[in-house]
């Protein structure tokens, strides 16, 4: 794979993983800390997309979203990155853009670095979300990259509390 293919594949995986996490969280609306992390993944991705597209962001970096708003933003972010990268020429990954962060500081960063950051940042927070799910006896989402590539879930260690509860039923 060339660099553009890696970026596109990483962002496609992110969209897929966000869908998997949404499904796991939808069944656990009481996990407010996990929802806060999930909404941040979406909010940060939208903020970065807005910077890349040189427009104001429609949400904050740490938005407070309803279930419906989170689902709509998840879809908008996935579609937005697909659209953005489909129009991007391979050489544009090294183009540098200027933007202002949420603290008001100005930075200059290559488009490829921003796109890679979006994918990696999401993975970091998805791991935290899965840990929060597991700590609350909820089934984590199998959102590993290899599961995305294979099209089947990676091996998942059962949540002991769930395993015992099902055995008692």
Placement of each model-derived feature along the sequence:
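Short, contiguous alpha-helical
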Residues: 4, 8-63, 102-165, 169
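Helix-adjacent hinge/juxtasegments
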Residues: 57-100
